[in-house]
Design a protein with these regions (language model features):
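Flavin (primarily FAD) cofactor-binding/catalytic cores of flavoenzymes
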Residues: 1-35, 83-187, 191-388
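Conserved N-terminal glycine-rich FAD pyrophosphate-binding loop of Rossmann-like flavoproteins
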Residues: 35-62, 215-230
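Coupling/switch segment of ABC-type P-loop NTPase heads
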Residues: 48-88
Length: 388
């Protein structure tokens, strides 16, 4: 039985390793991702904002053994491999571990660089058409292509001069030196602000936020990582209620205390000014608020990503042509094994209603791998069907 994972980021790679650990042979696995190497987007984005440590603890990584990264850090003798009481792993160490595991499981041999143009069921198999017109036939598909497809650029910045989203394809490193203004309220904006401060000895950086700083250790309360909260959540029948809980429990636009304290230090030294005024417009190199017009050199946006989950052509095609079921809240109606259609599985945001507030981060990938593990065992026990 052949498995294809669409998306070679952290979650797709986590699931791929789980399948290989379960005994899936190398020639029965394909990973489709547009980047040249697996997990490249995460690595690129982390470097763009100079994030020294991950937000999640050291037990959250791509290998099935929760202590694998900790053991790796010890063997590799990383100095300052973790930070703080929650043992947040050093980003470079984390990525070193990722690359080691990708190499160990020969996942680069499974990687096809490209985009999926179409996905359809034909003669009992899934048929995947890529942007180069290559067609892949596979028995099982896992959608793990993430939620970071299109950076969110608020309307007032759409036509403004010298404005770029930090995660946009048009971004280049020369923009750091020209930028004194950052827009955003979360962890990416905080890291980016600190990067700009550290790149200059005297430049004053302006951080524009649309709310007070929200200090949270993690993306959501750790109770959502286990039965403490998830048992009740999974007993709720209403998809609308589940979605409401997820939106309430996710700490969107927040940052851990240590980041806040680093920002505070620069406020006190005069290197950082935080603005909480509502920005009315941006034009002629000026930021207009109700009180003032402040000139800017270059603005870097750290405003997150657009909610494009269900807008992807591949997803729309499955809904229209394969009758893929949706819940009342509009998200895929999936099983406890994250199965949307026969032998088509979800991870990340598409599995929100099963995985809860942590669905979209590293731990969500680990939980998705565990759910799909059960499906793999079930399908492997079935008689092999011959296709026409």
């Amino acid at each position: 039985m052949h498995w294809t994972i669409i998306g070679g980021g952290l979650q797709g790679t986590t699931i791929a390793i789980q399948l290989r650990e379960l005994g899936l042979s190398r020639d029965k696995l394909t990973i489709i991702d547009p980047y040249a190497t697996l997990c490249e987007q995460f690595n690129d984005f982390s470097h763009r904002i100079s994030m020294p440590y991950l937000r999640s603890p050291i037990v959250h990584h791509i290998h099935p053994n929760p202590f694998h990264l900790k053991q790796f850090a010890k063997v590799q003798q990383y100095a300052h491999g973790t930070y703080g009481q929650y043992q947040r792993p050093q980003t470079d160490m984390f990525m070193h571990h990722v690359h080691e595991q990708v190499h160990h499981y020969d996942l680069n041999e499974n990687h096809i660089q490209g985009y999926v143009e179409a996905l359809a069921k034909k003669d009992g198999q899934w048929q995947i058409q890529l942007n180069d017109n290559q067609v892949i036939h596979t028995d099982c598909v896992i959608l793990a292509n993430g939620c970071t497809h299109k950076p969110y650029i608020p309307n007032i910045y759409q036509d403004a001069d010298d404005v770029c989203h930090i995660f946009d394809k048009s971004f280049n490193t020369t923009m750091y030196g020209h930028s004194s203004h950052v827009i955003g309220s979360g962890i990416s904006a905080a890291h980016l602000t600190l990067k700009l401060i550290n790149q200059s000895h005297d430049k004053v950086i302006h951080l524009w936020m649309n709310k007070d700083i929200d200090i949270q250790h993690f993306d959501a309360d750790p109770g959502w990582l286990g039965p403490k909260n998830m048992n009740h959540f999974l007993n709720i029948e209403s998809s609308l209620e589940r979605q409401s809980i997820i939106q309430h429990e996710r700490h969107k636009g927040s940052m851990p205390r240590e980041l806040y304290l680093r920002l505070k230090k620069h406020i006190q030294s005069g290197r950082l000014i935080i603005h909480k005024e509502n920005i009315l417009s941006v034009d002629q190199h000026q930021i207009h608020t109700e009180q003032a017009a402040i000139p800017y050199d270059f603005i870097l946006l750290a405003t997150g990503f657009e909610p494009t989950l269900l807008k992807q052509p591949m997803i729309q095609s499955l809904i229209k042509n394969e009758d893929a079921p949706l819940t009342r809240c509009g998200l895929p109606s999936i099983s406890s094994e994250l199965e949307w259609l026969p032998q088509l599985f979800m991870s990340g945001g598409l599995a929100d209603l099963e995985l809860g507030p942590f669905a979209r981060n590293i731990m969500g990938g680990r939980e998705a791998a565990q759910r799909i593990k059960q499906a793999y065992k079930r399908l492997s026990a079935q008689p092999i069907q011959k296709h026409a």
